């Protein structure tokens, strides 16, 4: 499930082991987050296309526009279409929002939507291609968040001609989850960093367009469950910043579609699929899961490792099915 790095790594190993492999992708273009989430300046699309074409030549079958859980269910794949095993690697791509007033205004995006539009609609080739979204050109852009996705979004906005591009983060720079080099590159390119601030309301005009964001300054209290000190609002510190584009990079969670349409598939309290840490087997026989849909947001390297681990487990599972069939045939003959 899903043509992301986790499933591509799994597919590559399984096809080499001699199995027939089909990969289902919900979108119209293959590659998952490698294509629609990571900007062109960090990972050129031609590299991903090359790797996918290598898998095609080796016999992997790719199907696009297949939304598992809607177009087809897991049970239909196994019971009706005859697949012996299923590997779920759909990632954790459901964006989190701030749940503050004004998020409906034109010009307010989730980082997922913003980067997907930029990548799949080739806006990164601006000005050769028109921007297929509320224009960043000559506008003030604010990105809320401090992770790698926030850095991708703010640097993309600059490449789309933004007049200014700023990171607004509720803790200090030291607590930012983004890699140090990503922060360094953003600063080198002219991104402004505003820390210990938190948006509390988006403001707009009578036409429904974003015009500003109201923020409050923060102090740091006791550490929370992440080990970082919790931001605490400072009374009377409200201020308003003009902006016409705001991008929310506040993290992601698991899309519940597959979990809700697959009876017998165990999930965690946070909605991720529960899988054995060593084998990646789920509570449903023949169904395996790995990557962000199990662990939550992680790195590309960990995702690839999960795919290769799943391939080994699936291979062992399929060999056990073959042994059971041979044993049944032997008993029948006797």
What residue ranges belong to the model's regions?
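FAD-site-proximal beta/loop scaffold in flavoenzymes
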Residues: 104-138, 223-297
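Feature captures the FAD/FMN-dependent oxidoreductase FAD-binding
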Residues: 1, 6, 49-100, 201-214, ...
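Beta1/beta-strand and adjacent pyrophosphate-binding region of the FAD-binding site
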Residues: 1-6, 137-147
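Short glycine-/acidic-enriched loop or helix-start segments at secondary-structure transitions
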Residues: 10, 73-74, 97-99, 120, ...
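Beta1-alpha1 glycine-rich phosphate/pyrophosphate-binding loop at the start
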Residues: 1-70, 96-103, 113, 150-196, ...
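Hydrophobic, well-ordered secondary-structure elements that form the walls
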Residues: 186, 247, 307
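A conserved FAD-binding loop/helix module that cradles the flavin
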Residues: 153, 290-324
């Amino acid at each position: 499930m899903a043509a992301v790095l986790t499933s591509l790594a799994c597919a590559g190993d399984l096809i080499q082991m001699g199995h027939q492999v089909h990969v289902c992708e919900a979108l119209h273009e293959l590659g998952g987050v490698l294509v629609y989430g990571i900007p062109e300046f960090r990972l050129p699309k031609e590299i991903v296309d090359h790797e996918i074409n290598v898998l095609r030549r080796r016999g992997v079958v790719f199907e696009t526009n297949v939304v598992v859980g809607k177009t087809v269910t897991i049970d239909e794949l196994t019971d009706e279409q005859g697949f012996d095993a299923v590997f779920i690697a759909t990632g954790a791509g459901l964006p989190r929002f701030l749940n503050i007033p004004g998020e409906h205004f034109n010009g307010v995006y989730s980082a997922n939507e913003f980067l997907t539009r930029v990548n799949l609609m080739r806006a990164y080739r601006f000005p050769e291609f028109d921007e297929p979204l509320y224009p960043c050109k000559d506008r003030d852009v604010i990105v809320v968040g401090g992770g790698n996705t926030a850095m991708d979004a703010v640097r993309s906005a600059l490449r789309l001609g933004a007049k200014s591009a700023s990171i607004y983060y509720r803790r200090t720079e030291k607590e930012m989850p983004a890699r140090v080099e990503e922060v360094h590159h953003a600063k080198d390119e002219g991104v402004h960093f505003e820390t210990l601030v938190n948006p509390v309301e988006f403001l707009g005009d009578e036409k429904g367009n974003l015009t500003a964001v109201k923020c409050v300054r923060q102090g740091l209290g006791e550490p929370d469950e992440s080990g970082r000190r919790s931001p605490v609002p400072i009374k009377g510190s409200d201020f308003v910043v003009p902006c016409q584009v705001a991008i929310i990079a506040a993290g992601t969670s698991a899309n519940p579609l597959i979990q809700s349409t697959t009876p017998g598939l165990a999930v965690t309290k946070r909605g991720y699929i529960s899988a054995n840490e060593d084998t990646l087997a789920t509570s449903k026989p023949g169904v395996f899961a790995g990557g962000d849909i199990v662990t939550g947001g992680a790195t590309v390297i960990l995702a690839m490792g999960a795919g290769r681990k799943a391939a080994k487990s699936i291979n062992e599972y399929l060999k056990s099915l073959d042994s059971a069939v041979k044993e049944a045939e032997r008993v029948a003959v006797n």
